[in-house]
Amino acid sequence: MTRPPRVDRRHWPALRDAFASLPADSRVFDWQAAFPEVMAQGGFDIVVGNPPYVRQAALGPFKPYLAARYASYHGVADLYVYFYERGLELLAPQGKLSYIVTNKWLRAGYGEPLRRLFAERAEIEEILDFGHAPIFEDADTFPCILIARHRPPEPRPEPSLVRVCPVPRDRPAELSLDNYVHEHGYPVPWSRYGAEPWSLESPEVETLMGRLRERGVPLAEFVGVKPMYGIKTGLNEAFLIDETTRAELIRQDPGCADVIKPYLRGQDIKRWAPDWQGLWMIVLKSSLNFAWPWQESGDQAEAVFARTYPSLHGHMKGMEERLRARQDQGRYWWELRSCDYYGIFDEPKIIHTDIAWYPQFAYSDGPLYFVNTCYIWPTADLFALAAMNSPVMWAYMWRHAQHGKDEALRLFNSFTTTLPIADPTPEIRREVEERAAAALELTRLTQRESGELLTWLRLELGVEKPGQRLETFADLTGEAFAAEVCKRRPKGAPRLTPRTLTELTDTHRRYATAAQARAAQRRALERRMSDLVIQAYQLTDAEIDLLWRTAPPRMPGAR
């Protein structure tokens, strides 16, 4: 960070005149010219602000300047990052800065240069984190307030403390902020805040998180593999199809059935087991990875493709212009991009989405394909699956993952590879794997029966779009289920007869009772797996009590 040079007092009038002569719409602002007396004294005593929230994508033309001018520069940093550095530059020695901005820079990779700058050039006094609280209308910004004191670039002074206070997300406007911070804030050693992601947890919780790291092995090392992205199609409309389209393509050309694979959306990846909804992906691998008949046909490749898979060629031909315009494509315009790990989609795997509202890691041992919003771990390790779905790991992920909209967690592979998984004893591993397999089977059975019920509603009563309430029918009473079915039937459909309504509620009772019993069995299995995973971490009774007392939102098996 380079502080602006001081300007000789004799030049102040000329600077003021020059600054005043700038056009009214000029974007230039020279702090030396505007405040020469202040800058001559070393800067401002206080800088307070609410910097504009301009995303990095809009900064393209300015990035070369920002890179050359700001030590806090990062290629994907938003504009407020540079306001922080500029604010520090404008402070006099021991002056204070306080901004309200998004809290994402505290943990995000793009915040590392700024965090390093604060560690080297400032002394943090307070951090107030509002999380998902709606401080600003119509803006989901995850605000935080930071108060820092500017200090010269010299070795850190003796250890000092930062006052940290997470502010309740509900009704923040009703709080007396001063009183709340005084009563609920806690001191955190300043030494915690360097270039690495900043934790705002209390010292006791941070110690617990440290125990998990000490007693765990990074997930990628534990399972011996790294996660892979799903497939980037470049044009989902061309490659992702429903059952009706698949059936027609195969009717026209039975030979294409082998290249049409089951496809999962992110919303179909449930806790323990994926819930396939009858969707499909046309997997035309790149000729760079697969020996298609047209692989080396040059100008004749499309003709060979048309002869090999006539129905697929016809399907793709209508979208040729958009397919050719893709960045993500194979050697030929109808192919998917090059990918050297297609095989893992057909093998046993743990899968999850990149956005998690709840721990929903799933296992599949059959062929399933995904797009790039999902991650695939090519492993059959059911202990790892149970650990990833466990309360203790959710507590860890909540405190270390990047948070997104509505406080969903962003499970990027750069983060999940580092999740600390405890190495279990053979006895713990065996018992956890047995229970994980049982939870998988219960989940799959419920999914199959749910599919049966929804298919019956579609064929018998015309319910084409069941919606979330019918998909979670076991949570409804018989009357509520019947009312929802009536609401979801086509407009103009005849009213249901008393006999049909009785059949409907009887069917619901039969399926719901079985689903509720399986859910209770699974909860019992999960409680035992949770206890076993905690044993693997060798947590003390006090640490276990702390884990549950400080449980984050949506903790599975919350007590």
Model-predicted segments: where are they?
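Basic, amphipathic N-terminal segments
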Residues: 1-33, 40-46, 58
